[in-house]
UniProtKB/Swiss-Prot annotation:
Gene Ontology terms for molecular function: glycerol-3-phosphate dehydrogenase [NAD(P)+] activity; NAD binding
The protein's name: Glycerol-3-phosphate dehydrogenase [NAD(P)+]
Chain residues that bind NADPH: 11, 31, 79, 111, 226, 252
Coiled coil: none
Taxonomic source organism: Gloeobacter violaceus (strain ATCC 29082 / PCC 7421)
Enzyme Commission number(s) from the entry: 1.1.1.94
Length: 305
């Protein structure tokens, strides 16, 4: 299979390596790379979008200008929300390439661990089962297990929404709040993800799988996670600017928190953890006050959402 990977960051190069290891022909495009976008797209049978969310719309415009032949599979591996529409990256691709098969790839996939040869699993989801199956076969190996799903909305939203909860988990660890508090935070974070995800058309059960709970557990517990690193630094009293300056790559949860909080307010959608993390990121509330605000919310019966 001839594959074009858009984005030369850690995740893009990792996916390129996984596909190349299965004897597929892979070309990678990045803004600083040697290959032009047209060269990378030429004769591609699948295009993997591994771009930072902020770059997606602009690159789509470039791909439109160059043209993409019918039948080319578009694979979205970006985990973020668009500032203008408050929609995930796949929605941008779908709007401009409605006649192309769309596949979403998401799961508990820390690029550094995969590059080190450690085992991992992921999900490729699509309304087009044949397209999902082709991408599954393209990437699967003895160290990278790939599942398919028809719930592409739920699979993508799990990866997007968990970034905000990972920041919260990092704050909790930075403050030294202990295992009890972190367990409560992750559990209620999952409930918040399900509430938002089902509002946007995902299936609740999808969030208990690899792309939801699996990705959530990984990013909330690993210092390799950029979103966790942001939260941990804030919990230690560092400024957001200082944390981001040291960060390698993009912590999508920072932008996602602000976009989601604004959307939720307009839509009367309850997102208490996101609201508090947004306040901390914006310097409106110190982490200890955000914790107190969560702990003193109205008492209620536990539910899954």
């Amino acid at each position: 299979m001839r594959i074009a990977v858009l984005g030369g960051g850690a995740w893009g190069t990792t996916l390129a390596d996984l596909a190349a290891a299965q004897d597929h022909q892979v070309r990678v495009w990045s803004r600083s790379g040697a290959l032009a976008l047209g060269e990378v797209l030429a004769q591609a049978e699948a295009v993997f979008s591994c771009l930072p969310m902020a770059a997606v719309a602009g690159v789509i415009d470039q791909v439109i200008a160059l043209g993409l032949p019918a039948g080319v599979i578009v694979v979205n591996a970006t985990k973020g929300l668009d500032r203008r529409t408050a929609r995930p990256a796949s929605s941008l691709w779908q709007a401009r390439f409605a006649d192309h098969p769309l596949v979403v790839l998401s799961g508990p996939n820390l690029a550094a661990e995969i590059r080190a040869g450690l085992p991992a699993a992921t999900v490729v989801a699509s309304a087009d089962g044949q397209a999902a199956g082709r991408i599954q076969q393209c990437l699967a190996s003895e160290r990278f297990r790939v599942y398919t799903s028809a719930d592409w909305r739920g699979v993508e939203l799990g990866g997007v929404l968990k970034n905000v909860i990972a920041i919260a988990a990092g704050v909790s660890d930075g403050l030294g709040l202990g295992a009890n508090a972190k367990a409560a935070l992750i559990t209620r974070g999952l409930a918040e993800m399900i509430r938002v995800g089902t509002h946007w058309g995902g299936l609740a059960e999808t969030f208990y799988g690899l792309s939801g709970l699996g990705d959530l557990l990984t990013t909330c517990n690993s210092p390799l996670s950029r979103n966790y690193q942001v939260g941990f630094g804030l919990g230690k009293g560092q400024s957001l600017e200082a944390v981001l300056e040291r960060l390698e790559g993009t912590a999508e949860g920072v932008a996602t928190a602000a976009i989601l909080a604004e959307y939720a307010q307009r839509s009367a959608l309850e997102v208490p953890i996101t609201d508090q993390i947004c306040a901390v990121l914006g310097g409106l509330r110190p982490p200890t006050e955000a914790l107190a605000a969560l702990m003193t919310r109205r008492l209620r019966e536990e539910d899954g959402g």
